Amino acid sequence: MGKSDHLKLFGKKSGGKDARSPETRSRNSRSSTDNRSSIGNNGSDNPLARLSDLDLEEGVDDDADFDWDTLPLPPSDAQSLDNPFNSGEALPSFRRRGGPTSNDAIERDAVDTIRDTSGAYEEPDSASDGEDVGMNDEYQRKRERLVDVNDSASEVSSPRRESREGKNVRFHTETDDINPEDPIAAPAANTEAGTGTNENGEASSSGMKSSINVDDEEGSETSSSNNENKLDHFKKFFRRGSVQNKPDGGEDGAEKGMKSMKDDDNDDEKEGGGGFFSKVIQNIKDANNGLAPGLRNVNLHPEADPEKNSVQEAEVDGDDIQLVDFNSVAKGLVKNYSSLPQSAHHQKEPAILEGDTMYSPSTPSSSPGPESFVAAPMDDYDFDQVDSDGEDSDLDPFVGAQTYVPPPQRVRGGVLGSLLKMYQNEDVSDSFSTASSIGEEPAKPSKPLLDPHFSKGKIPTAGSLLHVPSSAASHLKKNAQQLAGGAHNLATKHYPGRKNEEASGSNSELPSFKNTRPKKNKKHLPKFKKKMAAEAKITVHIADLLQRHRFILRMCKGLMMYGAPTHRLEEYMIMTSRVLEIDGQFLYLPGCMIVSFGDATTRTSEVQLVRCAQGLNLWKLHQVHSIYKQVVHDTMSASEGNILMDKVLQDRNLVPSWVCVLLYGFCSAMVTPYAFGGDWVNLAVSFFIGTCVGALQFIVSARSNMYSNVFEISASIVVSFVGRAFGSIGGSKICFGAVTQGSLALILPGYIILCGALELQSRNLVAGSVRMFYAIIYSLFLSFGITLGAALFGWMYKNATNETNCPYPISPWYRFLFVPAFTIGISLINQAHWIQLPVMVTISCTGYVVTYYSGKHFKNSTEFTASLAAFVIGIMGNLYSRVWKGLAVSAMLPAIFVQVPSGVASQSSLLSGLQSANELIKTNSTKGGDAMPGASDLSGSLSFGITMIQVSIGITVGLFGSSLIVYPFGKKSTGLFSL
């Protein structure tokens, strides 16, 4: 290694050349090898072993004469590569330790490094700077004094050298002081820390991994003489290190001295990472590093290039471009922003509360401050996606009438999800300043203050909000490196003619923020219109969704109030929700329907409870069914269906209450001859008693809730008491059994038990069990009332009649008159329209014919007779629905009501109460208590309920059988409105 190589190693930018001969250079190289071997064994041979920083400052002049050739040269490259640890050679250690001893050791290591890494010294010009040369004599005396302490030096140097083995030395300098275009300084700056190679790829003298970055401040300014003092360079180097350790930092506090790599990292953390970004910027400016700016492009074993070496020794002239201290600029920005008045970035009355994190730049009161945030919208909704023509719209009509309505692939979201979609960006729309007139376009959204997350008008996602600090000052500190990294490039781009401007104390380096309203931009108009169209579309979607929910609830209420088949209510609701694309679930209980509307967007559900008093209104049931079919087949919208449903619900009944009272008496008179064998006289009595029952039900019970709870018991008591009283009149031919049963026929629980049996048959266990049990208890109430009324009159009148059968029945041919009359009467009581009467009468008469003749053939078989009649009724009703598109339920119910009294009359179950009453009277009048009425009383009380169950089971089996024949695969588009 020659002198020129050592000069390049220390970053010397001079144009001088080595004037020595090759023989001299070879001799110096061999001398350096011998001297280094002696230095490794004995530290006393080092003339600078005890030289301290203070001694250098006091005894060495910047221009003192010194013979650089007297110092030994480092070993050759071949020796260092073959034996890296030759003669105890070790790297210096700069690990900080506490106390003066540690500082002295660091200084001694630095001086030894000068000795180990330096080449032949040259004697500088003593008069170059014009200072006193007498300091050289004092320096020589100090050297002689230091030689006398060889013993102590050897004791200290040996362990010290051992501790330096394996340590890395880094002479850190400011990267800004190195000109990347300098062919001499740039290779030194590009040398990677820890590689142990110089710019030519040769191994260093120690053979270990080390990074030696030499700082030569004067070489970048101008070309100097070849007699530059290198000892003065290291003197300044050590002075910077000592000044930097002071608390105030000194004048050269911005510069960095010789320190360890650990301390260098600590300083980078104190500066907020500015050193790291400066290194990244400098690496980008240096050699082409590709996509890894943190790694230097250094070849460990490049080939020697003579032309490159000659270029590196050339003199480079030019002025340094004084760079801006970006850290100080960033700190100044933070300081200036923090010193703004409170009203500049805070509201007097803060509008940014919990849940309201948006701000509108169009109003000064909502300007962004340190505490203002911009909340991210929901990621699962995109306004651009709503208006795309390629996707299906929520308002697209459902495909027309189909034979089958499968479960929808996509259902409409709930109201809550739609509201969230509509209002999630409500404040974002405020960021567009509203136009002051109709012809103005919305203004461009203003960008928040110094916030890179909000660039290009974008709103940060929820993940980026986690990194937003709580104040603008801390946010600026966090982004100071990014701001500083682009400051120099922006200044160079916009002001290429500026050179050597003052960076400190100048407000020109601070960015200016115009306090003006942004200009309007026409390019945001389509986006604004698009967003307004999306909001309008969501509004229409919400309105339509509410209409569909309301239609389902209105439909459910109408079906329950007007007597739809309870075992098919859930099926009707499911079909309706499928057609309307509503995620609905339904659970029916007697008198109550639980409706749940699901919302897949928010994973929530809206539960509605529909409760109403179940009744029977055949005409309104027909109207509700007509509306249902039109909506399901998509010939009517849900909003139009709601209008019609409201009209149906608000309409008055076709038959008023007082007419129903008279019809009650008429039906009682009509049912007495053909069902219970009464004669013509019994018709008048049954009419009178039936009218009383109708008055109790339609007038008294409707006005008193308390009485409605005991209506059945009170009516049975009154009918039994009055009927036995009329039957006890001598010679009147009034039949007690026919009058009593005919008057109570309209309040028999036939329909209730029928609905319960149908529900149980259709696997609706909850509703069917409840209704069936209620029907049994209801029958027991009636039986108890008949018994109590008959017993009361028997106690009052000793000669009360006990006859249960009429001795004078009417001819059976008159039944062809009474059955249609009873059908018309019961249909009018149940609010049937006159256009429905012909079908009802036809089906009812057909059913009774089957009952009459089957009863003649199968005696004492109530279940079988009712089953055959119900089967025929079901066949005719379902054919009417399938062929003539009518409502099967309304046509079949009057015929079923005709079957129930006939079945009950065949068993004479109502008169079991009379037998119980007679037993009670006989028991009280008997002395000695021989009678045992327990068994007969128990059988008489339960016989009526058992008879009702038998009739209902027979009707249920017949109805299901008829539905299976007419609709073997069921109705697919709509539910089967049949019993």
From Swiss-Prot:
Any GO molecular function: transmembrane transporter activity
Ranges of Basic residues composition bias in the record: 516-528
Start-end of Basic and acidic residues biased regions: 15-26, 105-115, 138-148, 158-175, 253-263
One Pfam family recorded for the sequence: ThrE_2
Record field: compositional bias (Low complexity): 29-38, 360-372
InterPro entries linked to this entry: ThrE-like_N, ThrE/Ser_Exporter, ThrE_2
Chief location category: membrane
Keyword Transmembrane helix found: yes
Positions of region (Disordered): 1-279, 295-318, 337-411, 432-451, 491-528
Keywords: Membrane, Transmembrane, Transmembrane helix
Membrane disposition: Multi-pass membrane protein
A single GO cellular-component term on record: membrane
UniProt similarity note: Belongs to the ThrE exporter (TC 2.A.79) family.
Descriptive protein name: Pheromone-regulated membrane protein 10
Organism: Zygosaccharomyces rouxii (strain ATCC 2623 / CBS 732 / NBRC 1130 / NCYC 568 / NRRL Y-229)
